[in-house]
Amino acid sequence: MPANMTDEELLAAHVAGDPNAFSELVFRHRDRLWAVALRTIGDSGEAEDALQDALISAFRRADQFRGDSQVTTWLHRIVVNACLDRIRRNKSRPTSPLPEFDSAELALPPGDDVIEQRETQLIVAQALAELPDDQRAAVLLVDIEGYPIEEAARILDCPAGTVKSRCSRGRSKLAKRLEHLRNPNIDEPDQEPEGGHGAQ
């Protein structure tokens, strides 16, 4: 496949029957899609399955791409939805720290050593996991992946105001949950009981 083909051209070529176009599209974006899946679910096995589900769905539904957003936005939407579906179905919980994610991203104090930083990552990952699904997806896309509100809204298929609200609520919960990391004199809070997932 020509390297200078745009994502839109590759997707159109796939729909037209080119057997290599979709593979090239996946090759371009798989690392980013994988990072989103892993950060959303937290478990590498579940993330791999969710990403596979998403790519199969994108492969089969390519003819439904309307062109009202970028192909990458469309792909991310499918991946996020696949992850949220799997979370709701399996009630997955993170068992490992998020990749390429450190305490600085939430303005946390750096650890004195690798072990302390790893423990901090585990705590942050668990705090993210305790957010309702929709709030976690919004926080991950906007605050960790760096998407603008408007693009995150397109990925999540909801109004920009809803994304802002979910981010605000999610940040507030994270700040409360992680306050003990900023202030060592504060005890770590008890984990909230499960059952709030999916709330807006």
List where the protein language model places each region.
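Helix-turn-helix DNA-binding module
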Residues: 45, 126-137, 141, 145-162, ...
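Internal acidic/polar
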Residues: 3-7, 93-120, 187-198
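Arg/Lys-rich amphipathic alpha helix in sigma70-family domain 2
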Residues: 60-67, 77-98, 109, 116-117, ...
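A short, charge-rich alpha-helical start-of-domain segment used by transcription regulators
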Residues: 12-35
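Structural recognition of an alpha-helix C-terminal capping motif at a helix-to-coil junction
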Residues: 35, 49-56, 69-81
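Short amphipathic alpha-helical boundary/capping segments
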Residues: 9-13, 123-132
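Conserved RNAP core-binding helix
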Residues: 10, 34, 44-61, 145-147
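Sigma70-family region 2
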Residues: 15-16, 39-44, 53-70, 89-92
